[in-house]
From Swiss-Prot:
Native source organism of the sequence: Geotalea uraniireducens (strain Rf4) (Geobacter uraniireducens)
Protein name: Polyribonucleotide nucleotidyltransferase
Compartments it resides in: Cytoplasm
GO MF, one annotated term: polyribonucleotide nucleotidyltransferase activity
Signal peptide limits: none
Reactions catalysed: RNA(n+1) + phosphate = RNA(n) + a ribonucleoside 5'-diphosphate
Protein family according to the UniProt entry: Belongs to the polyribonucleotide nucleotidyltransferase family.
One GO BP: mRNA catabolic process
Cited InterPro entries: ExoRNase_PH_dom1, ExoRNase_PH_dom2, ExoRNase_PH_dom2_sf, KH_dom, KH_dom_type_1, KH_dom_type_1_sf, NA-bd_OB-fold, PNPase
HAMAP family assigned to the protein according to its UniProt record, in alphabetical order: PNPase (MF_01595)
Functional summary from the UniProt entry: Involved in mRNA degradation. Catalyzes the phosphorolysis of single-stranded polyribonucleotides processively in the 3'- to 5'-direction.
Binding site for Mg(2+): 483, 489
One Pfam family here: KH_1
Length: 696
C-alpha cells in the first residue's frame, strides 16, 4: 500500500513516500522536493555470516544522468565509477546512521540512494540522508533512528535551512548537520573565518530545523512500518572472560600506557599471542572471543585512566598538543613544499601552480564546471607500517582531501588577483591520528612557501571525547588509538580569526551543546598554539614565486579585437604560442592571461598581441614594412594585418616621379599617421617623418 507524508521545510515541501517503488527491499522510500527525487532502499541479510565480528554496512549513492536530462559521456554511454561528489555524499549518508545500529547486529546491510530527478535548488544529497533514515525506519532492520540532515547557510546574518544555489553564493557558512531528536550526530562543512560561537549557533539552528523531518518519519513509520527483527544479546562466556582477565588484565594496564605507538602495539600484540597460547588447549576454537575480551579490556583501561586520572595514553593531559616540527622549501623543484610533523603523524605537502589549462573540468547533472583549487590527500600503507594493494584513492582519502581543501579554500586570493590553478598534494608519511589536519597545516605552509598570497595561515586540530554516563573528557590532538577507543572525532580548522572547516563524527547516540561548545573552545586554544609553531618557520607568503612556477601576466583588449588575436582558425594565437612557448588564455571579456616561466618570452608574446590589436593614432610615428608598391604610392604595414597608404605626394619633400625611386617592397620605413577616414583607411606620410626618430 502506498503511504505518503509531507512536511513544509525551509519554505519548500518535502515528500516521503513508501510502498510504490522497490517493494522487495527491506525498506524503500522516495524523497522529493521540487523537481528533485531520490529513491533510497535499505536491505539487510537474514543472518550474519559465520564468524562475522564487525558490522558490514555499505552505502551507495548514484546520480543517474537522466535525472538531469543528460546522456553520459564516454565510449560506453552509461554511468561509470562514482564521482568525487558521489563518494562524498556516500560518506554523508553513512556517518550519521552507522552509530545507530545495535552493537551486536552484524548482518550485511546495504543502503542505496539513487537520484532519479534533480533540479538545482533541492540538494539530492540532503534528501538522501533523510531517505536513508526513513527507509530503515519502515523496514524490519533494527535501527535506533530516526535522524535527518540539513544544509545550513547564513546570508546577511540570517541562518537559512537548505539554502538555494543562489543563496549559497552569498553565504559565509556552508555546513551539513545530521541529528536525532535529542542530539547532534554529525557535522561537516566550511565557513569564512566564522567565530566558534557562530558555528555553534549554526549547528543548533540546523538541529532545531530538522525536527519536522523527524516527526514526518515517525508518522510514516507508524503508518507503514513493520516490526523490527529481534537482535539477541551476545552470549558471553564468563569463564573464558575470567581466565583472559587473570592472564592479561594487569599486563594490559601497563601496555596501554606505553607512549610509543609501535612499542605499545607490539606489547599488546605480545599479550594477545601469549594469552591465546595459554588458553589454546582449554578453550580451543575461541580465538575470536579471546581477542574480543582483550579489546574490551584495552577500551576499558584507556578510558578509565583518562576519566579518573586525566592522563592519556602517551602521558599528556587532555589539552596538551604533541611536539610539532616544521620545515619548508625542502623539495627543490616543487613550487612550494612543507614537511609538517606532529607527534607520530607526518605530512609531506607540495604546492604546484598552473594555468587555466590545468583547471579540473567537472561534469555534473547540471552541466560542466571548472575547479581551480585542488587538494589531493594520499594515505599510503607504509604510513602505518602495513602493506596493501592500491587501486587509486579510496573513500576515506577523498573525504579527508575534501575536508582539507575546504579548510584552505576560504583563504585563497581572488582569481582576478591571482589567476593560477593551484594543486596541493599531501602525502602522509606517518600516521598516528589527525593526518587530515596535518594536511591542512602543511598545505597552508606549502602555499605560503609557493608565494600564494593567502589571507592568513590555517591550522587544524582533531578533538576527541571520552564519555561514561555524565562524566566526560574532551581531548585535544587525539592519537589514532584515542580515535579508535573514544566516542568522537571532531576536526576543526581555521585561522586565528575564525573557523574555516569542521567535521564531527561520533560513535554514541549524539553530543550535547555543552560538549560541542567546550570542544570548539578547546580546539581554538589548540589551533592558536599550532599556528604559533607554524609561524616559527614561515609567517606570511613569500613575495616571489618559485623560479620554476609559471608567471601569469594579464592584459586586456577590446572585445572586438579578440578575433584579431585568435585569427582565422586560431592561426594568430597558435603562431604566438609556437614562436614564444607561452600559454595563452582568452575569455570573452577581452581578458588575456599569458603564462610562461621565461619573462622574455612573455614580453614578446605581449608585444605580438599588442601589435595584432593596436590601432593607428593620428600624429603618431610608426616603423612600417612596405607590403606593396603602386604607381600612386605604397601600402605600408604598421601592425600585423594593418596597412596604410603613403601617397606618392607624401613620400618626400621633393617631387617624386616613381614610387620605386624611394621605396621597394620589403623596405622598412618610418612613417607618420596623418589621418584616418570614416571608412577606417589610414593615411601615412614618409615626408612628415623625415628627420624624426621613434621614441624609446
Amino acid at each position: 500500500m502506498e503511504t505518503k507524508v509531507q512536511v513544509e521545510f525551509g519554505g519548500r515541501t518535502i515528500t516521503i513516500e513508501t510502498g510504490k517503488m522497490a517493494k522487495q527491499a527491506s525498506g524503500a522510500v522516495v524523497v522529493s522536493s521540487g523537481d528533485t527525487m531520490v529513491l533510497v532502499t535499505a536491505v539487510a541479510t537474514k543472518t550474519a555470516k559465520e564468524g562475522q565480528d564487525f558490522f558490514p554496512l555499505t552505502v551507495n549513492y548514484q546520480e543517474k544522468a537522466y535525472a538531469g536530462g543528460k546522456i553520459p559521456g564516454g565510449f560506453f554511454k552509461r554511468e561509470a565509477r562514482p564521482s568525487d561528489n558521489e563518494t562524498l555524499t556516500c560518506r554523508l549518508i553513512d556517518r550519521p546512521i552507522r552509530p545507530l545500529f545495535p552493537e551486536n547486529f552484524l548482518n550485511d546491510t546495504q543502503i542505496m540512494a539513487t537520484v532519479v530527478s534533480a533540479d538545482k535548488d533541492n540538494d539530492p544529497g540532503i534528501l538522501s540522508m533523510v531517505g536513508a533514515s526513513a527507509a530503515l525506519m519502515v523496514s524490519d532492520i533494527p535501527f535506533q533512528g530516526p535522524i535527518a540532515g540539513v544544509k545550513v547557510g547564513r546570508v546577511d546574518g540570517r541562518f537559512i535551512a537548505n539554502p538555494t544555489a543562489d543563496e549559497m553564493e552569498k553565504s559565509d557558512i556552508e555546513i551539513v548537520v545530521a541529528a536525532s531528536k535529542d542530539a547532534v550526530i554529525m557535522v561537516e562543512g566550511s565557513a569564512a573565518e566564522v567565530s566558534e560561537e557562530d558555528m555553534l549557533e549554526a549547528i543548533f539552528f540546523g538541529h532545531a530545523a530538522i525536527q519536522p523531518l523527524l516527526a514526518a518519519q515517525e508518522e510514516l513509520c507508524s503508518k507503514a512500518g513493520v516490526a523490527k527483527r529481534e537482535v539477541p544479546p551476545p552470549a558471553v562466556n564468563e569463564e573464558l572472560k575470567a581466565n583472559v582477565k587473570d592472564i592479561a588484565y594487569a599486563r594490559m594496564k601497563e601496555a596501554v600506557r606505553i607512549k610509543s605507538k609501535v612499542e605499545r602495539h607490539n606489547s599488546i600484540d605480545a599479550i594477545s599471542a601469549e594469552t591465546l597460547a595459554a588458553l589454546a588447549t582449554e578453550f580451543e576454537g575461541c580465538d575470536k572471543q579471546i581477542k574480543a575480551f582483550l579489546g574490551d579490556f584495552e577500551y576499558e583501561l584507556v578510558r578509565e585512566h583518562i576519566l579518573k586520572d586525566g592522563e592519556r595514553i602517551d602521558g599528556r593531559d587532555t589539552k596538551t598538543i604533541r611536539q610539532i616540527t616544521t620545515e619548508v622549501s625542502l623539495l627543490p623543484r616543487a613550487h612550494g613544499s612543507a614537511l609538517f610533523t606532529r607527534g607520530e603523524t607526518q605530512s609531506l605537502v607540495a604546492a604546484t601552480l598552473g594555468t587555466s589549462i590545468d583547471e579540473q573540468r567537472i561534469d555534473s547533472l547540471f552541466g560542466e564546471s571548472k575547479k581551480r583549487f585542488l587538494l589531493h590527500y594520499n594515505f599510503p600503507p607504509f604510513s602505518v607500517g602495513e602493506t596493501s594493494f592500491r587501486l587509486g584513492p579510496g573513500r576515506r582519502e577523498i573525504g579527508h582531501g575534501m575536508l582539507a581543501e575546504r579548510a584552505l579554500a576560504r583563504v585563497l586570493p581572488k582569481h582576478d588577483d591571482f589567476p593560477y590553478t593551484i594543486r596541493i598534494v599531501s602525502d602522509i608519511l606517518e600516521s598516528n591520528g589527525s593526518s587530515s589536519m596535518a594536511s591542512v597545516c602543511g598545505g597552508s605552509m606549502s602555499m605560503m612557501d609557493a608565494g600564494i598570497p593567502i589571507k592568513a595561515p590555517v591550522a587544524g586540530i582533531a578533538m576527541g571525547l571520552i564519555k561514561e554516563g555524565e562524566d566526560f573528557a574532551i581531548l585535544s590532538d587525539i592519537l589514532g588509538d584515542e580515535d579508535h577507543l573514544g566516542d568522537m572525532d571532531f576536526k576543526v580548522a581555521g585561522t586565528a580569526e575564525g573557523v574555516t572547516a569542521l567535521q564531527m563524527d561520533i560513535k554514541i547516540g549524539g553530543v550535547t551543546r555543552e560538549i560541542m561548545g567546550i570542544a570548539l573552545k578547546q580546539a581554538l586554544e589548540g589551533r592558536l598554539h599550532i599556528l604559533g609553531r607554524m609561524a616559527d618557520t614561515i609567517k606570511t607568503s613569500k613575495s616571489d614565486l618559485s623560479t620554476y612556477a609559471p608567471r601569469i601576466t594579464t592584459i586586456y583588449v577590446k572585445t572586438d579585437k579578440i578575433r584579431d588575436v585568435i585569427g582565422s582558425g586560431g592561426k594568430n594565437i597558435r603562431g604566438i604560442t609556437e614562436a614564444t612557448g607561452v600559454t595563452i588564455d582568452i575569455d570573452d571579456t577581452g581578458k588575456i592571461n599569458i603564462a610562461s616561466t621565461d619573462k622574455a618570452a612573455c614580453d614578446l608574446a605581449i608585444k605580438m598581441i599588442r601589435d595584432l590589436t593596436a590601432e593607428a593614432e593620428e600624429g603618431k610615428l610608426y616603423m612600417g614594412l612596405v607590403k606593396k608598391v603602386m604607381e600612386f604610392g605604397a601600402f605600408v604595414e604598421i601592425f600585423p594585418g594593418t596597412d596604410g597608404l603613403v601617397h606618392i605626394s607624401e613620400l618626400d619633400t621633393e617631387r617624386v616621379k616613381n614610387v620605386t625611386d624611394i621605396l621597394k617592397e620589403g623596405d622598412k620605413v618610418l612613417v607618420k599617421c596623418i589621418g584616418i577616414d570614416k571608412q577606417g583607411k589610414i593615411k601615412l606620410s614618409r615626408k612628415e617623418a623625415l628627420g624624426a626618430t621613434l621614441p624609446e
